[in-house]
Swiss-Prot record:
Keywords: Blood coagulation cascade activating toxin, Calcium, Disulfide bond, Glycoprotein, Hemostasis impairing toxin, Hydrolase, Metal-binding, Metalloprotease, Protease, Secreted, Toxin, Zinc, Zymogen. GO terms for biological process: proteolysis. N-glycosylated. Its EC number is 3.4.24.-. This is Factor X-activator 1 heavy chain. Ca(2+) binds at residues 11, 13, 15. Expressed by the venom gland. Binds 1 zinc ion per subunit. It comes from Vipera ammodytes ammodytes. GO terms for molecular function: metal ion binding; metallopeptidase activity; toxin activity.
Length: 15
């Protein structure tokens, strides 16, 4: 599922 925490350059990361 997709995480609600921003990762990398403000993009959402799939976890």
């Amino acid at each position: 599922l997709v995480s609600v925490s921003p990762a990398f350059n403000g993009n959402y990361f799939v976890e």
